[in-house]
């Protein structure tokens, strides 16, 4: 009985992350639909340049690069030197990689972005 309750709580916590009520709003869903409608990189550049500030876009790109480097087992020092990210940002991205919704890893696999370090 205890094991069942523990498993249910763990699943509920995972579902809670996936269905964050603060994030899952009609406005965010509409934004994601807009992103999914883009057909190429040029359209992405146009859209994101209109929607985001340059600093917001650069921050997103930096986090993506940090995540890639963390998955390649680079050190915080190497990552900070290459990307200019603070250790707080690197830690935040690392937490997402380890306890998040697997969004980074899903994209990395689809884009074949990680070096073959497992061999």
Describe the function of each predicted region.
Residues 43-62:
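Short, Lys/Arg-enriched anionic-surface-contact patches
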Residues 31-38:
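Short, charge-rich, low-complexity alpha-helical interaction segments
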Residues 107-119:
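Intrinsically disordered, low-complexity basic tails/linkers immediately adjacent to helix-turn-helix/homeobox/MYB/SANT
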Residues 87-110:
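C-terminal structural segments of small proteins and small subunits
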Residues 78-83:
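Short alpha-helical "recognition helix" segments of helix-turn-helix
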Residues 60-74:
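Short, amphipathic alpha-helical "recognition" segments used to contact nucleic acids or chromatin
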